[in-house]
């Protein structure tokens, strides 16, 4: 019998034992006992999902540099990090930022960014927590990898120092709301929109009618309000005049060298260069370098672990995940403003 089948037998035995235990419990206590027992079994199979520290470089215990990573679209899919297949998990990342704020041994942060951006709300949440870290006099050095555009730049603008490679794609400072309008197609098919509304603008950006001039004006003002907030974040973080930022913030992208020339990036370099600079400039050469990990057995990534998690409702199905991502990116009935590079 191969390893996979032995695991399956073990799971089956565990579930059988659970059902026997629960069956012996009377009435109203049964559901509570079932949940408690199931939680215990899940911890054995999957792990506790608690955030733990993994040491990358040994050093002084009272001096820590925390390495953080934003890798992927900045969107809150609502999934637990334990069962998430997305590269970036928003709630888990926010928890890491708060953990830094609570740890007095943390003396520096190295942030790696490889993201085209994402939701304006999620980006603002990250920027808010990063600002709290800076208020604690904890320096933040950021290293851009392949892409750090739009929301990826937004969350980094307040860093003490930003590094990028010559090949990095950054910039794309701006806001986008995207949607489809198929009113012309409906007209050709002889389909009539029958929407009843309390006000003329109640169904703004509906794909079923052509937008009016007033509607276009209102939506554009909404977009520009978010744009102004983005510009202010960059101006404050980079110590630049808002008009100077606006000249750069027409949505265009920059490579690393262009970003340095325009004051959006401080220095050409990789993650290790940013870390070396942080250590030397902030007198942290003897610091311990750590990153946060979630306690997991790895069972959640297996076929069997996936299926059991879906059966318990702990993990979204593949179709649910696809729908969730599309909704977060605005591919739903309600278009959303995004700090996002690459269109929608």
From Swiss-Prot:
Its EC number is 3.4.21.-. The chain crosses the membrane at residues 6-26. CDD domains: S49_Sppa_N_C (cd07023). GO terms for cellular component: plasma membrane. GO terms for biological process: proteolysis. InterPro entries: ClpP/crotonase-like_dom_sf, Pept_S49_SppA, Peptidase_S49, S49_SppA_C. The active site is at 150 (nucleophile), 202 (proton donor/acceptor). Signal peptide: none annotated. The keyword Protease applies. Disulfide bonds: none annotated. It is an enzyme of class 3 (hydrolase). Digestion of the cleaved signal peptides. Belongs to the peptidase S49 family. This is Putative signal peptide peptidase SppA. It comes from Enterococcus faecium.
